Amino acid sequence: MPCGKCYYCKKGLYHLCDDENGFLEGGFAEYMLLPKNALIHKVSKDIPAVEAALCEPLSCSAYAVNQTGMGMEDTVVISGLGAIGMGMLQFAFLRNPKRVIGIDTNDALCEIAKKLGAAEVLNPMKEYVTKRIMELTDGVGCEIYMEATGNPASA
């Protein structure tokens, strides 16, 4: 829970709060015990739980894409096609980049990314991804690489 008093909280950057008790377990639990000064966003009962559950990963995806400054001439590579990566894929399309390439080891997720419009989807267990990206971009590579696997080895 952000303290609301430190430098970062005063700037609205609650995720950088200096308070050592800033992170509590159970964010996706049905019930949680919170301090009375906690920032709480109540989800309306008319929003289905499945849709409400996507608010957090999609907000992360939107924020990440917005931070890139992505434009129409960019080749974008998104590594990791789970909820956050698929969100990045969709938000990237709103920026109309030159091409979006997805990377994942899960063939089912690769197929979904293709159906959503990825120009190419690569599986690092089946091909040398860097070489293939260089082939697809005439040796240029990508302007924007977005990591959504959570695996340090993929960065």
Predicted feature descriptions by range:
Residues 48-127, 131:
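Mid-domain Rossmann-like dinucleotide-binding core that forms the NAD(H)/NADP(H) cofactor-binding site
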Residues 82, 150-152:
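Short beta->alpha connector loops
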